[in-house]
Amino acid sequence: MTTLTLDEIERQREFNYRRTPERRVRTLEEARAFIEEVDFCHFWPIKGIELPNLFHAIAGRVRPVPMEHDDPDISKCWGWKDRALDKKWWYYGKLLRRRATLVSLAELPYFYALSENYGSLDDYLQEYADGLMTAEAKAIYEALLEHGPLDTIRLRREARMSAQSAKSRFDRALVELQVGLKVLPIGVAEAGAWRYAFLYELLPRWFPDIPEQARQISRAEARRVLVLRYLDNVVAADRKMIGKMFHVLKRTPAELDRTIDVLLQKDAVREMQVEGMKGLQLVSTHAMGRDL
């Protein structure tokens, strides 16, 4: 059996995540290529979560996120993201771990196939009737449904949550809608005290082809594709980390186990000890085939 070490895995992650001076992301076009390479990543590094992120790819190394807004890596990260919002190059919104996530359009149908959506703009009514959507999320969704794209300030007003006392409820509901792949930011407006506010729209209107593409994908296939893509990027992870990574997709432990079992049967992944890592790790055989 092939023996792997944590050092070998970390070297491959440095390459995959573009955390090297040679592969660092230097332009907006390279940022777009990076998202298409990894298919999904976080915007920022998230403590305790193994996943590529755009900030480290721009920095070309692991570094703390600085507080200074004039830091060159921070400026590129924010600026390129804002410039790309209306380009329809990728999905950007709160998703994995309920944090800012970028997803390639090639991979987005697989995430959508695991959501509660079927592609109709009125799907939300059944979710609300079933108790799967909060009243605040319903109000925000209906404001966008009626008025089209709205900046955050006007969206709060149209959803009748403009009072300061309603801000936390509004923010939670907006994250709920993004995690549910119903709403996403599509631009930036000069609104509010800071003259900066996201412009939001309904995902099926912004990406009308995604629901139809997702209809061709079973939930089981979607889980297999996403878990395997994740392992191709991170090289190795245990079952607990995979569960944490995809917790918002509402899979049961049994569904995750079945997904992993199929990947093991296909020899797409192998479960093994890795020197320097605790417990059994699921390792991508595609990654193992590279020059680790």
Where are these regions (language model features)?
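Long, low-complexity intrinsically disordered regions
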Residues: 1-292
